[in-house]
């Protein structure tokens, strides 16, 4: 059996739902370093992890399968992530994920509760990663801009707001995650 260690980080990001026109404005202004096609399968358990505002998925990108669990914190989101050998409910039944489930009071097994495909236009900056996401969620197009801060949080936010300003956009906080739009808004 292959051992895939779990990574933990505190995700601080700014997200905004946009129209297709706004998406194109920012993409044309910033350019992109690469475009990734991501297949996301969202999972839940009984009782539901959404009652604790926890989201979990396995994302297939570039031939790899990444398990991610997002747990809200006072500031940011605790993100637990590890590579898996496959995208299936059975792949989640391993010691590290069972320990995480125990810590959070969740139980296996899990079941699929939603799926989506995202075309991520990625641009890396010194203060963070700009992700321009066009997703197909339950048969409809969804456009979202994310700036995931990798440096100083205040400088990263200022940089992102300046990018939006250059594109003629004003920041509108997005309170609905992709998980919520895919799973809860069906």
Where are these regions (language model features)?
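Acidic/polar low-complexity flexible segments
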Residues: 150-186
């Amino acid at each position: 059996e292959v051992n895939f260690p779990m990574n933990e980080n505190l995700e601080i990001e700014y997200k905004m739902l946009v129209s297709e026109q706004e998406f194109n404005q920012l993409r044309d202004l910033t350019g992109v370093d690469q475009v990734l096609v991501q297949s996301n399968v969202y999972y839940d358990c009984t009782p539901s992890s959404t009652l604790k505002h926890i989201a979990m998925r396995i994302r297939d990108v570039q031939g790899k399968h990444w398990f991610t669990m997002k747990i809200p914190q006072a500031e940011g989101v605790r993100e637990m992530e590890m590579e898996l050998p496959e995208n299936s409910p059975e792949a989640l039944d391993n010691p590290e994920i069972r320990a995480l489930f125990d810590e959070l009071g969740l139980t296996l097994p899990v079941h699929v509760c939603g799926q989506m495909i995202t075309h991520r236009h990625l641009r890396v900056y010194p203060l963070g990663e700009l992700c321009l996401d066009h997703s197909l969620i339950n048969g409809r197009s969804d456009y979202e801009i994310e700036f995931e801060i990798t440096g100083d949080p205040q400088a990263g936010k200022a940089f992102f707001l300046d990018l939006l300003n250059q594109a003629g956009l004003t920041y509108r906080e997005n309170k609905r995650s992709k998980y919520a739009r895919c799973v809860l808004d069906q």
